[in-house]
Amino acid sequence: MTSCSSFSGGKACRPADDSALTPLVADKAAAHPCYSRNGHHRFARMHLPVAPACNLQCNYCNRKFDCSNESRPGVSSTLLTPEQAVVKVRQVAQAIPQLSVVGIAGPGDPLANIARTFRTLELIREQLPDLKLCLST
């Protein structure tokens, strides 16, 4: 059984009973702001718009949507190259020491943009090895 809680831009779901998780997974979830019950108050996260392509073309998905009041994974005003993305991450990490997770969630499907996605993750891993990497497809 899972429990979902609403947040700006969607829902976060996790097992209703954390004892169902292995100790390794429970430790990782506790330090990840998307899955930890209290983590989103202590850790900062950043999503990088490096993946424009999507092979699904779902009717409900409008990846061209761009609104200054809309801030969630998959909505972006600009597209970054992998090199631009790692520069941006370094700038944010310097300004916000709580940054602990960097994710790629669009604006398309990261796995439909495998070269850009993996190059971005590779550069971040090389230059900022303490950050957790997240991929949402």
Swiss-Prot record:
Positions contributing to [4Fe-4S] cluster binding: 54, 58, 61
UniProt xrefs under InterPro entries: Aldolase_TIM, MoaA_NifB_PqqE_Fe-S-bd_CS, rSAM
Binding site for S-adenosyl-L-methionine: 60, 108
GO molecular function: 4 iron, 4 sulfur cluster binding; lyase activity; metal ion binding
Bound cofactor: record note: Binds 3 [4Fe-4S] clusters per monomer. One cluster is coordinated with 3 cysteines and an exchangeable S-adenosyl-L-methionine. The two others probably act as substrate.
Enzyme Commission no: 4.-.-.-
Cofactor: [4Fe-4S] cluster
Recorded metabolic or biological pathway in which this protein acts: Cofactor biosynthesis; Fe-Mo cofactor biosynthesis
Keyword Metal-binding set for record: yes
Entry superkingdom: Bacteria
Domain (Radical SAM core): residue spans on this chain: 40-137
Keywords: 4Fe-4S, Iron, Iron-sulfur, Lyase, Metal-binding, Nitrogen fixation, S-adenosyl-L-methionine
UniProt-listed GO biological process terms: nitrogen fixation
Purpose of the protein: Involved in the biosynthesis of the iron-molybdenum cofactor (FeMo-co or M-cluster) found in the dinitrogenase enzyme of the nitrogenase complex in nitrogen-fixing microorganisms. NifB catalyzes the crucial step of radical SAM-dependent carbide insertion that occurs concomitant with the insertion of a 9th sulfur and the rearrangement/coupling of two [4Fe-4S] clusters into a [8Fe-9S-C] cluster, the precursor to the M-cluster.
Family of the protein in this entry: Belongs to the radical SAM superfamily. NifB family.
Protein name stated in the entry: FeMo cofactor biosynthesis protein NifB
Upper lineage: Bacteria, Pseudomonadati, Pseudomonadota, Gammaproteobacteria, Enterobacterales
